[in-house]
Amino acid sequence: MVLLTMIARVADGLPLAASMQEDEQSGRDLQQYQNQAKQLFRKLNEQSPTRCTLEAGAMTFHYLIEKGVCYLVLCEAAFPKKLAFAYLEDLFSEFDEQHGKKVPTVSRPYSFIEFDNYIQKTKKSYIDSRARRNLSSVNTELQDVQRIMVANIEEVLLRGEALSALDSKASNLSTLSKKYRQDAKYLNMRSTYAKLAAVAVFSVMLIVYIRFWWL
């Protein structure tokens, strides 16, 4: 289930729009997650990963950054990641069309709170079981969600570590892995060439031996 949706400006973390689950029981628990979302917005910058999943106990944050705006959703951990990012892509398309040009100029929090109407309507379509089945089958153009970086929300917030730093670590690991594969390929090539050279030397020596000793 989609429990909380927030949209914020990346440059300064200013909340632009939000929508929270109306259920009272969920509402009592969601304040903590809403505070975490606001803290997260303040840590984002231009170097932050554009797509990220942050685990938060029984819940999971997913966010998407497009054109300087962060679209964030809080879901139950069992909610499919692919649907969560399809939902965020949907919000981005509509929000950018309606308010994209005004985002850099606003200074008041929740300047686009009326966008909640669209959020509510879209959220229902992703929660409905039949709609979810349809979305799962038609949303083939969405990028491979398995490649999206995953981190823990409390570790990010408590350590005070910017998401750009986490992204840098992930990039470094990827670079090291690539270098390891290249080195392994190079060593395999050297080994192959050495074997071929040994065969060539043996062949030449054999020819010389036969020519001078048997002819």
UniProtKB/Swiss-Prot annotation:
**Which parts form a coiled-coil structure per UniProt?**
none
Stretches assigned to the v-SNARE coiled-coil homology domain: 134-194
- Annotated Gene Ontology cellular component terms: endoplasmic reticulum membrane; endoplasmic reticulum-Golgi intermediate compartment membrane; Golgi apparatus; melanosome
Subunit structure, per the record? Answer: Component of 2 distinct SNARE complexes.
Concerning PANTHER family, the annotation shows: VESICLE-TRAFFICKING PROTEIN SEC22B
Function as written in the Swiss-Prot or TrEMBL entry? SNARE involved in targeting and fusion of ER-derived transport vesicles with the Golgi complex as well as Golgi-derived retrograde transport vesicles with the ER.
- The protein's name in its UniProt record: Vesicle-trafficking protein SEC22b
Source species: Xenopus tropicalis (Western clawed frog)
